[in-house]
Amino acid sequence: VESVYELHSVSKFYDNVRALDVISLSIGTGEITGVIGRSGAGKTTLLKILAGLELPTAGKLLFKGDEIDRKSVRQLRRVATILFQTPLFLRGDVYTNVAYGLRIRNHSRESIGKMVVEALSLVRLDGFEDRDARRLSGGEQQRVALARALVLDPRVLLLDEPTSNLDRANASVMTEIIEEEGEKRCVVIATHDYEQIKKLADRTIFLEAGRIVEVGATDSIFSGPLLANMENVYTGVSRLVDGISHVDIGNGVEIKAAFSRPGRVVVHVSPEDIILSKGWVETSARNEFKGRITAVEDLGPIARLKIDTGKSFTVQITKRSLIDMGLNVDSEVYLSFKASSVELV
């Protein structure tokens, strides 16, 4: 894989806060790199540095072998595009928004028209040119923002939580597009959606408190001990009801958590904390969902199950329980867990 970025002992400070702490790595083209970690781990800061929106406080950033500094960073910005979780739009139609970057680069009107149509086709929004960009659904807006990035044919595409607030249909479309683009250019995704990373990323960078904990092939990262208990991580919007957080994680699934924090949150439920049954069971658990088993993984005395409830949950039970309950792929099951089992990430 051809190296695009090289970071040598890169650190980034905001006042006295160290957002990145002596990061050294290389990122190649023609592959998708995933960046994972808890909130505040430094994922977005890393993307901003790769996009040229921020410069390292210390260390060196190289792009195609050339060091990036205050003079050369403008050139990096022309070939690296970042897509944030909540995109901003100009007033007006979709065409105006997608064409904006081409206009300031002085493309002809004829070429702009052709390139906008092609970009909208790439994101499965054919015929959306005259639609009001600010009145589209969240999923459509995210795809318009992606079209606005792709129309510039960037060498590098940087994505910050690209599907966190999308429904399943739009998230699936975005995932397909990202997979296609990963074959053409350098793509880096920062996200809490571990299932998406496992599906898309060739390599994964695991950050914690601004430092690289592990970097390597995605399969190796997720089969290792560091991430064994980091399944069931969800981004959602929390509202407080009687002091309890009700977190909407999408697709009609709402998790009740024993903390009081409104707004956007990232939560984690350990697979071992989820109780599995073949029927409704009256317990003190505040979270109860009906689902269907989509996968069973044999881990010796333990079995790890994937259960689709509208959102995918990973549940870990003993092999004995799996056999005694007569469970297999496509079995209908019920899962429950306490509000106190839901942790902020």
For the regions a language model picked out, list residue spans one by one.
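Catalytic Walker B motif of ABC-type/P-loop ATPase nucleotide-binding domains
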Residues: 157-161
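Conserved ABC transporter NBD signature motif
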Residues: 59-67, 76
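Glycine/charge-rich catalytic "coupling/switch" loops of P-loop NTPases
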Residues: 251-295, 316-345
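Conserved signature/switch motifs of ABC ATPase nucleotide-binding domains
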Residues: 131-134, 152-153, 183
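Helix-to-loop junction immediately C-terminal to a conserved catalytic motif
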Residues: 51
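Conserved ABC ATPase "signature" region
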Residues: 110-128
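Helical segment within the ABC ATPase nucleotide-binding domain
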Residues: 171-183
